[in-house]
Amino acid sequence: MALQNKEEEKKKVKKLQKSYFDVLGICCTSEVPIIENILKSLDGVKEYSVIVPSRTVIVVHDSLLISPFQIAKALNEARLEANVRVNGETSFKNKWPSPFAVVSGLLLLLSFLKFVYSPLRWLAVAAVAAGIYPILAKAFASIKRPRIDINILVIITVIATLAMQDFMEAAAVVFLFTISDWLETRASYKATSVMQSLMSLAPQKAIIAETGEEVEVDEVKVDTVVAVKAGETIPIDGIVVDGNCEVDEKTLTGEAFPVPKQRDSTVWAGTINLNGYICVKTTSLAGDCVVAKMAKLVEEAQSSKTKSQRLIDKCSQYYTPAIILVSACVAIVPVIMKVHNLKHWFHLALVVLVSGCPCGLILSTPVATFCALTKAATSGLLIKSADYLDTLSKIKIVAFDKTGTITRGEFIVIDFKSLSRDINLRSLLYWVSSVESKSSHPMAATIVDYAKSVSVEPRPEEVEDYQNFPGEGIYGKIDGNDIFIGNKKIASRAGCSTVPEIEVDTKGGKTVGYVYVGERLAGFFNLSDACRSGVSQAMAELKSLGIKTAMLTGDNQAAAMHAQEQLGNVLDVVHGDLLPEDKSRIIQEFKKEGPTAMVGDGVNDAPALATADIGISMGISGSALATQTGNIILMSNDIRRIPQAVKLARRARRKVVENVCLSIILKAGILALAFAGHPLIWAAVLVDVGTCLLVIFNSMLLLREKKKIGNKKCYRASTSKLNGRKLEGDDDYVVDLEAGLLTKSGNGQCKSSCCGDKKNQENVVMMKPSSKTSSDHSHPGCCGDKKEEKVKPLVKDGCCSEKTRKSEGDMVSLSSCKKSSHVKHDLKMKGGSGCCASKNEKGKEVVAKSCCEKPKQQVESVGDCKSGHCEKKKQAEDIVVPVQIIGHALTHVEIELQTKETCKTSCCDSKEKVKETGLLLSSENTPYLEKGVLIKDEGNCKSGSENMGTVKQSCHEKGCSDEKQTGEITLASEEETDDQDCSSGCCVNEGTVKQSFDEKKHSVLVEKEGLDMETGFCCDAKLVCCGNTEGEVKEQCRLEIKKEEHCKSGCCGEEIQTGEITLVSEEETESTNCSTGCCVDKEEVTQTCHEKPASLVVSGLEVKKDEHCESSHRAVKVETCCKVKIPEACASKCRDRAKRHSGKSCCRSYAKELCSHRHHHHHHHHHHHVSA
């Protein structure tokens, strides 16, 4: 019986159809009651809504009782010009005015020749006759449904004007009125085309992966696997089960950059597969996918009205009858009083009558609201009602949840301990992870992943009686044990009256979770989380808008305060240890100060979201309940969209005020002109028409992008795999330029090697970190204009091989680091999501003077340079740059010079020369050394080099004694490349590491720790090719190019043969060219300077010419052993076109296998030679 009812319900739903109609006859809200009355009278119509600005009617009807064409026919009987809109259609049908308007206009124009030949004045009457039909038809339809509208008023005006023999005026009225209808339709189409394209994002067809059959998306069931080729739009929400690609989600979330997708990634209908072939297992029906829900929300929002709109609509009902009454009085009273010049009074009455249409006033609010809602939707913000847009413009306080809103919600398990002797750690972890598998909290997923990483497999099916206690924790029964997991408050649920005192680490914002087995505290765990990028920027923007910010979290106060510190103490109020009801209570208190918004993403936030004046829920990733409760939905996780939404709401409110004022002033102006003795009927019609158009065009300004103020930035071509690092949620104009800084050529354009396409650049500024000891100086010659205030993260996005990506912190694949014998313990410590991080990360700020040019002279830290050092006694400027020292500090030497910013020409005699003074504190007797750096003509930053901002230096420096030699190892600070490609992108230390060679003491001052912060593959591959002694890395590899097809390594030694690993970062592997993703410098061969045969080799000393080494020293060219040529090694394995998309992994695994084999073969050579 139940099954039968379900089947009947399904049939009933299938019979119901949603149809869209373009109704061109809608002028303003005065037509809405006419449409409603028509639709009410039709059998089979269940629901309907009218969107006035877009002239759209949406009808849900029984397809068996009434068809869309029958509904359109009923609307057209009232002369509403309705058409059924075909799915996905956004083209404008009426590209040209109606024939009535064209003929009427031509005849009116010819009638002006009456001054030459008077009988031609009758052409004006013909113009009236030619254009009056549409107006008459609409007026007749209005009379049938007794209602006075503008069409009836125009007919009365035309008849009266003709009666007074003002033929040209009557013709002008008819022509202006008929042409205005077309102009308004065209203007409103431009405003609505964006929204119509948004509504039809998802395709109507899908291809079944197994059979290749093309079917309607409505027929696709849940768990069906559909195929999506490159360039196609994803038809339905689902999970990728095969293949990988990049997806453009801009239309859905506002995300400007392509989002990489691989197996188990979620994809949404309406987003575009840019490259690659993927198979998607559907997770919802076509009508339930995110884009369909989004379209429904937008439709509901557009058909809703603000309070001001409802007030204007109510007033307009009385406005028109009142104007008709006034007009009648103006015409009749002078006749009764037998006033002279009755024609003037009749003209005046007609001007008043034509002013009786309040269309401009009525449209002033809905058009502005419509445009604002459209702009918000295309930016990844869904505002559920026009009223919420109005409220958002008045917001005074915004409160944020912490986990998943301010922070990423991507936790790392720092510690997991069992406190009970009879319960081992694995058993406890098994119970906890099994219960957590049933929770949707971000912490739960982290604990489940942690359990799997230590080979503990959770079994959620074994958990009984699962319960969730919002703000406290969760409960589940497994293996006969009652397991309670949560914060301190969960103790009371477990029946533990006194919480045992245990020492837990809450420093650094760690979140502590407690595990109770029955009434006994059995264990605890520590989790840490990081703030989202862009949050502090969003808070600063909200402050600049005069909005107070607050954080409300159920997490402990220490974690809350740590997040506040991470954000630079930008929040005004911070509350920790809150239950859901506590959040609601605090929101109530905030509301006393002014309208309050709450931003959250979880079940715990639902009560607070409902209590606030505006609830903003965090997007597609947010829980379903939060999305339902929120008044505004943030489709992405970028909090910077919130100040943007507030600005948009305030702009929309201003536009409404402007529109209302414009409408009233113009109407009042024409009436004042008429009463002042100039009653122009055609002018009154023109004002009526013009007001509507002005209101529409003024509102459409909301759809325009506001120009960003500031210098244009130089990017690589969008097709490059080496785009600048982009933080999560960054817009396309906010890009980390640290790795993307390139030179500018003399013609004011960035070089093509930097930008891909030449972008014009007037003011080119070098990015410079700020510090306490230095002010920001602009350095000419480098592209990029973003001045950073904080030391940048050490590693780029995408460095981890795991799914979860972080944009800051040290990142190395944990598995690769653990496997490598060369990486010391402190680099093997646990990082987040399988990433290594270094405990000894330090940032040093050092000062270098760039003013003086004479060797062996110390630069004074303050004041002018000594005479003769510079032209015109130019002021010495500090260059302060952070030196990142990873692992252990350098032995015995504090390096005080770093050539990150050598693009400085303002203080030297020659533009081709840069002087810097290095301070090496190896001993008291060491003199100050001055380094002369020559820069090539093409600009201060070398073109064609992926190693931005670094300049080669010779082995012997000016002012050095013969025994003292300095040099540098230059590592590429390049952006991330795709996934784990071996490339210059693997090198991540930001800047240059110096080494010093002291002959007298017969010792080499080198690093103790290799600076290997690469993706999993590169970490192993590069170390494979370098020698090792006693477990310490003595050399640092540097990939360089000798020819197009070779990548050279900078390891040294005659007997040591070092590796060359050439990988492609693009799908096409048959080309013989070495890709830019792999190589560092196309015109350079690194050589190694050996000081003495018996001494240890200092690797990485760069020698430009052989004469830099004395006769007893030899410059040895680096040869290659671990060579993987592209065509033979990779292309042969990837030649199958069906598997072409997996080419990169093929090449990578092959190279790794080959290189590892060679490494084992030559390992004893490495050891022997370096120990010599």
Curated annotation (Swiss-Prot):
Gene3D superfamilies: 3.30.70.100, Calcium-transporting ATPase, cytoplasmic domain N, Calcium-transporting ATPase, cytoplasmic transduction domain A, HAD superfamily/HAD-like. It is found in: Membrane. Mg(2+) binds at residues 601, 605. GO terms for cellular component: plasma membrane; plasmodesma. InterPro entries: ATPase_P-typ_cyto_dom_N, ATPase_P-typ_P_site, ATPase_P-typ_TM_dom_sf, ATPase_P-typ_transduc_dom_A_sf, Cation_Transport_ATPase_IB, HAD-like_sf, HAD_sf, HMA_dom. The active site is at residue 401. Residues 17-83 form the HMA domain. Its EC number is 7.2.2.12, 7.2.2.21. Its main location: membrane. GO terms for biological process: cadmium ion transport; metal ion transport; response to cadmium ion; response to cobalt ion; response to metal ion; response to zinc ion; zinc ion transport. SUPFAM superfamilies: Calcium ATPase, transduction domain A, Calcium ATPase, transmembrane domain M, HAD-like, HMA, heavy metal-associated domain. One of its GO terms (molecular function) is ATP binding. The chain crosses the membrane at residues 94-115, 119-138, 146-166, 168-188, 315-337, 346-363, 657-676, 681-700. It is a multi-pass membrane protein. Keywords: ATP-binding, Cadmium, Magnesium, Membrane, Metal-binding, Nucleotide-binding, Translocase, Transmembrane, Transmembrane helix, Zinc. It holds the Pfam family Hydrolase. Involved in cadmium/zinc transport. PANTHER family: CADMIUM/ZINC-TRANSPORTING ATPASE HMA2-RELATED, CADMIUM_ZINC-TRANSPORTING ATPASE HMA4-RELATED. Belongs to the cation transport ATPase (P-type) (TC 3.A.3) family. Type IB subfamily. This is Putative cadmium/zinc-transporting ATPase HMA4. It comes from Arabidopsis thaliana (Mouse-ear cress). The gene is HMA4.
